Regions:
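Short, flexible beta-strand-to-coil junctions
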Residues: 9-12, 70-72
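Short glycine-/aliphatic-rich beta-strand segments at the starts of folded cytosolic domains
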Residues: 1-9
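C-terminal end-helix/capping segment
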Residues: 23, 31-33, 81-85
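C-terminal structural segments of small proteins and small subunits
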Residues: 59-89
Length: 90
């Protein structure tokens, strides 16, 4: 399964907050692509709820994130290697 994870870390005085989320994704995903600054496509066997809990553990209450499965109906303008990666997994 491929999940889309998108987030906005609000009001952080810690620049490493984005690094904390990236570390969670890199260490828990089977594979991933990061086409935009705070957006990831994650290949995983875990649920959206499981990923929610992982991200919640390294963020603050004023942060926002969105997680959803990626299906075959989609459009966008992303690098070709991202499309190739998505097409191979969905």
């Amino acid at each position: 399964m491929v999940l889309l994870i998108s987030y906005d870390l609000n009001g952080h005085e810690r620049p490493e907050a984005y690094d904390d989320v990236a570390h969670v994704i890199r260490t828990n995903a089977i594979s991933y692509r990061k086409p935009l600054y705070s957006q990831w496509f994650v290949e995983t066997n875990e649920s959206c709820q499981s990923w929610h809990e992982k991200i919640k553990a390294v963020t603050d209450t004023n942060d926002h994130w969105f997680i959803c499965p990626v299906g075959s109906t989609r459009q966008g303008w992303l690098p070709n290697e991202t499309w190739d990666w998505l097409n191979a997994r969905t």
